Amino acid sequence: MRLISPALVVSTAIQARHVNSSAPVDSAMTEANPLASAHPPDVGYDGVPAGRVRNPDDPTTEERTPGESFMEAINFKIFKLVQEAQGRILGLPEQPRGDMEWLERYGQDAILHYLETGDKDPSQLEKKYDQLLDELKNAPNLEVEILESIHALFLAYMEEVAKPAVQTTPKLNEQPDKFAWAMINKARRNAKPGIRNPYKSLNIPLVENYIKKYNAFIELRQRELTLLDTFSCAFNHNTVKLAKFLAMVDTFSPKRTFVLAMRIELSEIWIEEKRTIAEVASILGISTITGYAKNRLSAGTFVRFIYQLAKTNEQLGPDIVKDLVKTFGPDRTTELLTRMKTVSPRMFTILKDHMDVRLKETGVTPN
């Protein structure tokens, strides 16, 4: 089934400006992106901007505003997809896909023009997409997950165009996994010198939602290590947000390399900030028994912090164990040290020996 390409939607989306902006499309963008019309298939396409008559020599062609063209395009998409589902149910032969090819090629430009002119209530766009999803939820073999992804991306798109601080200059061949990084980069670059925390200009829930929907980090492959500094700078080393974000990313098990690299990054920041073990445990939400049980993924980050801390000076071993026992108690400390085996068997042995010595001093028999 042919669907609007999320990558193309992202490329177009990043180009959008404020919803209420009346500025014309940049000429460079128009030259790079031939999507210069939002007219539906019955009107045709000849490179004339939406809202103008397609053919001045043909008075029968109807003038449409960008918003009207967009709504018509979405209605048309719903109709075609539902018609396709019905045809499959009834065993009808597949219809030619020329109309859907048109929508895939030109539909995004209608969105761009619609959002630039703001001539209709943007909430109507969300309703239209919701309607599309509702009608297709129970239709067989329509790749509803893809539709939901398009829906989520478009909602993110609508939200972002109202935030100039997080827009970026696009490249038409950009892949979806670059979208979150583009927003982060832009937030960092556009932060005023007087604002110590550029993160405030970044819509964290939106970025989280984007990554949840598209698993952007899964596609980063070898690029993650070169982007860690950018990522950290964007949050201005706000380790509370970084830790929360990492816990969410850690649910993407295939991205072990990124998770490990970010844990190292966080640990080094905390060490530079001279954070105590108790402070880091609090940041990660694992300082209490209940919090520890709920945030076991964050405990992995904590173990990495302990390893990095001990590696900087192995003479700190006894003090580290003392603080661990004070913060977590002997049982949870033992569990944390056991997890150290997967990080560094050698460091596990060193800290476990210190732990055994401490337990003997307090009259407790080591395990």
Curated annotation (Swiss-Prot):
Residue span of motif dEER: 61-64
Ranges of compositional bias, category Basic and acidic residues: 54-65
Region: Disordered, residue numbers: 33-65
Top-level taxon in the UniProt lineage: Eukaryota
Comment, domains: Has the canonical EER motif, but lacks the canonical translocation motif RxLR, which characterizes most oomycete effectors identified so far. The EER motif is not required to trigger an RPP5-dependent immune response.
Remarks, miscellaneous: The ATR5 effector protein is a polymorphic member of the RXLR class and displays copy-number variation among different isolates of H.arabidopsidis.
Name of this chain's protein: Avirulence protein ATR5
Organism from which the protein derives: Hyaloperonospora arabidopsidis (strain Emoy2)
Gene coding for it: ATR5
